[in-house]
Amino acid sequence: MNQNQLISVEDIVFRYRKDAERRALDGVSLQVYEGEWLAIVGHNGSGKSTLARALNGLILPESGDIEVAGIQLTEESVWEVRKKIGMVFQNPDNQFVGTTVRDDVAFGLENNGVPREEMIERVDWAVKQVNMQDFLDQEPHHLSGGQKQRVAIAGVIAARPDIIILDEATSMLDPIGREEVLETVRHLKEQGMATVISITHDLNEAAKADRIIVMNGGKKYAEGPPEEIFKLNKELVRIGLDLPFSFQLSQLLRENGLALEENHLTQEGLVKELWTLQSKM
């Protein structure tokens, strides 16, 4: 993984009301590196979505510093920072402004004054990256939830941001739609097209990331690669998170005498080892 620092957050504090005792963000510091997939996880009210909004300048912290791609985030620089970051939100139906997929992906480019020929090239390129090139003339309401989110991602990457933030972008999708979106994210990351930050309460999704930050009570609770974070096990359950099914099943099988090499973070890894064990019997 590239270790060029893309985002630096230093000791930020945020309250939704200035007179509130509770801090939605309470002294949070973190770094995001170019080319990585970072998952920020936590239960409802942990501060993870507030942090996403702070990174994009939708809210400004009352103290502390945020720097994005070398730009200090302030009221004056917020629009410059937003050119570096694209966001995909929770409800795909709230994100469409065009009457067709083509119009929707082109909308942000038109607003930014991109020349028509370049805009056509960017739209065609973006929809191919998310495998939606066969739906360019479809009306958005005819698409499935997963397809809608893939179109939303196409609209983001057409603008060529350095960073994509997925704010609970899979939480309203069925399992098929969720997997479609996560496969799209994996493809974008592997092709080096963007740094990805996914905000989620779903540890099955977070297990696919390079690194996880766990939020709790507005503070950073833990940080590390997925295999290290899941060793916290009961601590994660205690703060309101559900361990991935594959991890729980791996634990149960090992406790009952099956010689698995590890507690698997993904179903694919668990199935692969079970097949290997079966072939040796």
Swiss-Prot record:
Amino-acid positions noted as binding ATP in the UniProt annotation, renumbered to this chain: G42, H43, N44, G45, S46, G47, K48, S49
Segment forming the signal sequence: none
Matching Pfam families: ABC_tran (PF00005)
InterPro entries given in the database record: AAA+_ATPase, ABC_transporter-like_ATP-bd, ABC_transporter-like_CS, ABC_transpr_CbiO/EcfA_su, ECF_ABC_transporter_ATP-bd, EcfA_1, P-loop_NTPase
Compartment annotation: Cell membrane
Alphabetical keyword list: ATP-binding, Cell membrane, Membrane, Nucleotide-binding, Translocase, Transport
EC number: 7.-.-.-
Membrane association type: Peripheral membrane protein
Active site location: E168 (proton acceptor)
Residue ranges constituting the ABC transporter domain according to the UniProt record: 7-242
Keyword Transport: yes
A cellular-component GO term for this protein: ATP-binding cassette (ABC) transporter complex
Presence of the UniProt keyword Membrane in the record: yes
Enzyme class: translocase
Gene Ontology MF annotations: ATP binding; ATP hydrolysis activity; ATPase-coupled transmembrane transporter activity
Subunit field text: Forms a stable energy-coupling factor (ECF) transporter complex composed of 2 membrane-embedded substrate-binding proteins (S component), 2 ATP-binding proteins (A component) and 2 transmembrane proteins (T component).
Function according to Swiss-Prot or TrEMBL: ATP-binding (A) component of a common energy-coupling factor (ECF) ABC-transporter complex. Unlike classic ABC transporters this ECF transporter provides the energy necessary to transport a number of different substrates.
Family of the protein in this entry: Belongs to the ABC transporter superfamily. Energy-coupling factor EcfA family.
Protein name as catalogued: Energy-coupling factor transporter ATP-binding protein EcfA1
Species for this entry: Bacillus subtilis (strain 168)
